[in-house]
A protein has these predicted regions:
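Residue(s) in the substrate-gating loop at a strand-loop-helix junction
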Residues: 14
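Conserved catalytic-site region of short-chain dehydrogenase/reductase
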Residues: 17-21, 116
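Catalytic Tyr-x(3-8)-Lys segment
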Residues: 70-89
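C-terminal substrate-recognition "lid" of short-chain dehydrogenase/reductases
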Residues: 86-110, 115
Length: 119
């Protein structure tokens, strides 16, 4: 990336890194993903002059096999939009970031607004 004077790193975090939920054991997640979100900004500043960008996508609950259908009713309540994110929405956001050369150092939450506060 440095040789070609361009590049883009997109990290994947979690909305839990900055919006913990009571009863959800996420200490290790907070430690690792919180650090990842912090280093995104630091690296964005360090390498911006070389044309290399760093961004992070922080999804909330995503509709994957990791979340069984039986749990969906409860999990939907964790989003003010009352639904789970879809994998394709993460891909869409990634494609947007690839097409937006002036977006750098951002943590973008894909959680229906859950990170914004309580509802």
């Amino acid at each position: 990336m440095r040789l070609q004077k361009s590049g883009h790193v997109v990290n994947i975090s979690s909305s839990l890194a900055t919006q913990p939920i009571a009863g959800v054991a996420a200490g290790l997640l907070n430690l690792t993903k919180g650090g990842l979100e912090s280093v995104t900004g630091a690296l964005a500043m360090e390498f911006a002059g070389e044309g290399i960008r760093f961004n992070t996508i922080a999804p909330g609950v995503v509709n994957t096999p990791m979340n069984p259908v039986e749990a969906h009713e409860f999990l939907r309540q964790l989003s003010p939009m009352n639904r789970l994110a879809e994998v394709g929405e993460i891909a869409d956001l990634l494609l947007y970031l690839e097409s937006a050369p002036f977006v750098n150092g951002e943590v973008i939450h894909l959680d229906g607004g859950a990170h914004a506060g309580k509802w």
